[in-house]
Amino acid sequence: MNWLFLVSLVFFCGVSTHPALAMSSNRLLKLANKSPKKIIPLKDSSFENILAPPHENAYIVALFTATAPEIGCSLCLELESEYDTIVASWFDDHPDAKSSNSDTSIFFTKVNLEDPSKTIPKAFQFFQLNNVPRLFIFKPNSPSILDHSVISISTDTGSERMKQIIQAIKQFSQVNDFSLHLPMDWTPIITSTIITFITVLLFKKQSKLMFSIISSRIIWATLSTFFIICMISAYMFNQIRNTQLAGVGPKGEVMYFLPNEFQHQFAIETQVMVLIYGTLAALVVVLVKGIQFLRSHLYPETKKAYFIDAILASFCALFIYVFFAALTTVFTIKSPAYPFPLLRLSAPFK
């Protein structure tokens, strides 16, 4: 009787400490289908049950992130939508989360620190995470929940980073039928269609006007200047590196410029610099040519013409000074050692 009791006790302990915590693939699939994005949330009460092995040939990918503005994790914000795209790509081809070439399944989970004022998720404490984002993959027959592999997250952005993550998942799981499906961006197609339609219509209805516009020196000068300003403001750099629009500061504020960084920038920095350079160029043109044009067409016979010219020139010079001060402020933010600031205009740009 004692022998039978001991055997039963050992069997019960072994089952309850290891397999009982594990979830079947069907249960994981039900949890994934309950989520709108097919991502299983790792709650404090259930994350151990979800991640604990064995998983019946199921690999589980877990993202630990913190999108709270107070944290200031710009990479977390970037990875948020990229992770959604990766998960959607897998489930679009595999609605049952199972590979077409094998019995292997892949599920995706996530725990997010959205409000630092509340308690830190237990999953963060359990895995002793000191930084985010972190990407783990749990194998089906690992000895314990702590036996997992880390998927490195590169500094590349957009599709390149998503492809690298998918490639890492394929290597760990030996699943070959995992492809990235990027959502179709209809904006450039619709924009190109509308512009083409309007251009063809104008050429058909107003051919003389369109040819006069095309042959206009002013139009070509404006377009050439705008192109040069965009290039010197790192527009091409943004297109090549696919830089993020803006950053998040330590207090949750929006960052327009990367301090002390001449080699890196946010995309919005290009927009600000185009505005500054474009305004300066326009003001110089108005100062040199515009005032004369206004005088000859609006007040050619006015006795106080020179007085009006002086007022307009003074306003142009004042605005040139203000925008040039903004330009030097940007240089000061990018390099605090820059010794020639004109005005303290740093507040709008930080």
Curated annotation (Swiss-Prot):
Pathway: Protein modification; protein glycosylation
Protein keywords: Disulfide bond, Endoplasmic reticulum, Membrane, Signal, Transmembrane, Transmembrane helix
Ribosomal protein found in the keyword field: no
Major place of residence: endoplasmic reticulum
Disulfide pattern: 73-76
GO molecular function terms attached to this record: dolichyl-diphosphooligosaccharide-protein glycotransferase activity; protein-disulfide reductase activity
Listed InterPro entries: OligosaccharylTrfase_OST3/OST6
Topology in the lipid bilayer: Multi-pass membrane protein
The keyword Endoplasmic reticulum appears for this protein: yes
GO CC terms of this entry: endoplasmic reticulum; endoplasmic reticulum membrane; membrane; oligosaccharyltransferase complex
Other observations noted: Present with 4030 molecules/cell in log phase SD medium.
Subunit record text: Component of the oligosaccharyltransferase (OST) complex, which appears to exist in two assemblies comprising OST1, OST2, OST4, OST5, STT3, SWP1, WPB1, and either OST3 or OST6. OST assembly occurs through the formation of 3 subcomplexes. Subcomplex 1 contains OST1 and OST5, subcomplex 2 contains STT3, OST3, and OST4, and subcomplex 3 contains OST2, WBP1, and SWP1.
Listed PANTHER family: DOLICHYL-DIPHOSPHOOLIGOSACCHARIDE--PROTEIN GLYCOSYLTRANSFERASE-RELATED, GH11935P
The family this protein is said to belong to: Belongs to the OST3/OST6 family.
Protein name as it appears in the record: Dolichyl-diphosphooligosaccharide--protein glycosyltransferase subunit 3
Source organism: Saccharomyces cerevisiae (strain ATCC 204508 / S288c)
Gene name of this polypeptide: OST3
